[in-house]
């Protein structure tokens, strides 16, 4: 990062950290489980208020995504390999899970779902053209797919232009979020899922990448996690009896504060808890796409089944890569 933006202190990154950081993988696991617990609250399976902030796992995913992909383009900027890896990594599980959810909704829950809606999922457009069709977890994956097209272009920019772009994304998202919370709930709920609300997560992910590339550390892990806990408490104390104040507090104030903290944690992640937590991070994509369906079918137990199905479907696709990474942990 240019020195006139932040004061920094140098870090020494190990070879393993530059190539693969298990602490980052662990963060992905935490994010997926956070969203899984959040859906226990939205489905009213286990409506505990402590699960309400769980949706914040989504922007953590988005920040990590652009942060990691920009790093990988530093190592190998070959576009064929970049897109081939994204397709191999995302498409098989995405199409399998989208089709499975469609069939369960149609034949088990007897919901009114159409082939057209399934087609929109297949071409990554359902989140915009048919929001809330038959599974609303796929909207984030569709946003990611479109973002994958822009990340190589962002990577080619100078650090200064990356930073200016990041600031633009953050400000536009903040203005958008502040505006939509003033609308009636039905309109807000729809616009909340649209891409503009989430662009700030990518903005902070870009800034995290610039800072990391320049070996800059801002806060200690303990300080960042302490601040994260305070934000969590702030979320739980948001006034639920006033819809406007609640959405303003949670979707604007807390959301934008937590994005900064996520950036700090990405730059200096907490230590690895165990191989299990890292492994959950490695199959976090599978956990994310399967957990909601399993919760709808089995309730609380659905979280465990979601992890099991993620293991059965994602692990075989990346078996060698995952096992190699786990061996690195010793």
From Swiss-Prot:
What is its membrane topology? Multi-pass membrane protein
Question: Mainly localized where?
Answer: host cell
The UniProt entry, under Pfam families, shows: Acyl_transf_3
What EC number(s) are associated with this protein in UniProt?
2.3.-.-
Query: Which keywords describe this protein according to UniProt?
Result: Acyltransferase, Host membrane, Membrane, Transferase, Transmembrane, Transmembrane helix
Per the record, GO CC terms? Answer: host cell membrane; membrane
Identify the domain of life: Viruses
Mention one GO molecular function: acyltransferase activity, transferring groups other than amino-acyl groups
Q: Where are the transmembrane segments?
A: 29-49, 50-70, 90-110, 118-138, 163-183, 190-210, 225-245, 252-272, 273-293, 297-317
Subcellular location per the Swiss-Prot or TrEMBL entry:
Host membrane
The biological process GO terms on file are:
polysaccharide biosynthetic process
Family matches, as PANTHER family:
ACETYLTRANSFERASE, ACYL_TRANSF_3 DOMAIN-CONTAINING PROTEIN
Q: Mind telling me what this protein is named?
A: Putative acetyltransferase ORF330
């Amino acid at each position: 990062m240019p020195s006139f933006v932040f004061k920094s202190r140098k870090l020494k990154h190990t070879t393993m950290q530059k190539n693969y950081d298990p602490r980052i993988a662990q963060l992905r696991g935490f994010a997926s489980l956070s969203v899984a617990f959040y859906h226990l609250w939205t489905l009213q399976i286990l409506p505990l208020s402590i699960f309400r902030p769980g949706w914040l796992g989504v922007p953590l995913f988005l920040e990590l995504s652009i942060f990691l992909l920009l790093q990988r383009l530093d190592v190998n900027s070959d576009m064929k390999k970049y897109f081939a890896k994204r397709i191999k990594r995302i498409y098989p599980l995405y199409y399998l899970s989208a089709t499975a959810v469609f069939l369960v909704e149609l034949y088990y829950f007897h919901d009114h779902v159409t082939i057209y809606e399934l087609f929109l999922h297949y071409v990554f457009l359902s989140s915009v053209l048919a929001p809330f069709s038959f599974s609303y977890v796929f909207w984030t994956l569709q946003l990611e797919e479109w973002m994958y097209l822009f990340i190589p272009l962002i990577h080619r920019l100078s650090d200064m232009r990356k930073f200016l772009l990041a600031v633009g994304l953050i400000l536009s998202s903040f203005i958008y979020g502040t505006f939509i919370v003033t609308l009636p709930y039905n309109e807000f709920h729809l616009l909340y899922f649209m891409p503009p609300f989430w662009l700030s997560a990518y903005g902070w992910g870009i800034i995290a990448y610039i800072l990391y590339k320049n070996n800059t550390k801002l806060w200690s892990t303990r300080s960042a996690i302490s601040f994260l806990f305070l934000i969590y408490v702030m979320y739980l104390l948001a006034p639920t009896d006033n819809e406007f104040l609640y959405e303003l507090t949670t979707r604007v104030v807390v959301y934008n504060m937590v994005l900064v903290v996520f950036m700090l944690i990405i730059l200096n992640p907490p230590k690895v808890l165990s191989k299990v937590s890292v492994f959950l991070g490695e199959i976090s994509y599978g956990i994310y796409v399967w957990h909601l369906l399993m919760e709808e079918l089995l309730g609380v137990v659905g979280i465990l089944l979601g992890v099991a199905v993620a293991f059965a479907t994602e692990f075989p696709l990346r078996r060698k890569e995952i096992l190699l990474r786990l061996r690195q942990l010793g």
